[in-house]
Amino acid sequence: LVIQGEYSLLDTFNVFQGEPTVVFSSKQSPNTEHVSYETLSSDLSMPNQVCNYLYDRQIQSLIVEGGAQVLQQFISEGLWDEARIFVGKSQFSEGIKAPLLHEPWESVHNVEGDYLFIYKNPIQG
């Protein structure tokens, strides 16, 4: 699944090369051999539309990798079970801030000098 923002993604990207791909976009686009497009509605949030699409197809698992804005939308709507956050030694003074989780971490692991924090959504049980 790809969530496309205001700008179209190049069809030369690896995600469009051979495997079936679904693109959620605010623009209508014609389907191709391996790519189908789902038009996002303004009536329902993007995370809910993605989850409804997956539910209708009996897909029970989704890993969200993406920009901070996409991640924050899923987090803000409570549509997450688990988050894994790596924290390294480097600090950045500029750039896009990571999404915020207000829950305490459940566990932390040292992975080759970096730390992996695991969070569970308390609402999901």
List each model region and its residues.
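Active-site ligand-binding patch in enzyme domains
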Residues: 1-60, 69-72, 125
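Well-ordered beta-strand positions
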Residues: 22, 82-84
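Helical hairpin unit composed of two closely spaced alpha helices linked by a short loop
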Residues: 59-62, 66, 84-86
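Extended hydrophobic-aromatic, low-complexity segments
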Residues: 62, 94-95
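Small/polar glycine-rich anion-binding or flexible loop at a beta-alpha turn
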Residues: 66-73, 89-92
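Short acidic amphipathic segments
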Residues: 74-82
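Conserved histidine-centered catalytic loops in small-molecule metabolism enzymes
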Residues: 95-125
